[in-house]
Amino acid sequence: MLKNLVVLTGLSGAGKSTALGLLEDMGFYCIDNLPVKIIDQILPIISINIESLALVIDSRSGDIDDIVSVIENMKAKYPVKVIFLNAKDEVLINRFAHTRRNHPLLKEETSLEKAILEERKLFIKILELSDIVVDTSNLNPHQLRERLVGILTSVKKKFRLRILSFGFKYGVPLDVDFIFDVRFFPNPFYVVGLRQKSGKDKEVKNFLYNTQGVKEFLDLIKKVVDFAIQRYENEGRTELSVGIGCTGGQHRSVFFAEELFKFYNENCKVILEHRDVK
């Protein structure tokens, strides 16, 4: 009897093959590159004797409209979680250069950059159907495994809230549902004695606690997150990802992320990540 069905989808080069191997290590029966038109026929047969199944569905699988239709059918019939793997363009380009593989949409008259852009446009509908988006740009295989384990175990546990601090100067994360920009508060980087510290340190916390508007904005973030969690749970979703951004990802964003972690940690499973803390 099928209890766990995972659909891995996303951009070419974003790590679906690596993720599929990790799911296989976790006990999933894995199928890659299955034509989308036969999935509806095969699933009822497979689901009789398999508890955990992972499918890769991507641009090789068939027409985008057919893929959307199949995913919608699976969501109506099975306990499916759709995981969309994403990555920044420059990362995808480097990965294709490193592996020397061709992008599935690459043609003689098309550059790799244009092929990636075309695939992004094609996958907008699938991205909207996805339950979880994972940005693999900065993840090694071990970190990707940790993300997958957290995502899949959250199905059996209470709601999962992921809080990510980051610096805008290093790029906007692709796998968050909300982004709160805290750059309008004074930057501790320019305060004597605080430059080398982070938002985890007492001195930085005291500085920001005493900054006008910080507490009020923190309360506003909590109200938005509370509202989103309630609506996500009503729709059967199990994870909300919140990004907190400042300039360098060292002080203000870390402080706000730490405060949110303390506030929510007792009521739901909270994962705290500081992407750019050195």
Curated annotation (Swiss-Prot):
Xref: InterPro entries: P-loop_NTPase (IPR027417), RapZ-like (IPR005337), RapZ-like_N (IPR053930), RapZ_C (IPR053931)
Keyword annotations of the record: ATP-binding, GTP-binding, Nucleotide-binding
Signal peptide coordinates: none
Binding site for GTP: 58-61
Superkingdom of source: Bacteria
Gene Ontology MF annotations: ATP binding; GTP binding
Residues engaged in binding ATP: 10-17
Function, as annotated: Displays ATPase and GTPase activities.
Similarity-based family: Belongs to the RapZ-like family.
UniProt-listed PANTHER family: RNASE ADAPTER PROTEIN RAPZ
Protein name: Nucleotide-binding protein Tmel_1373
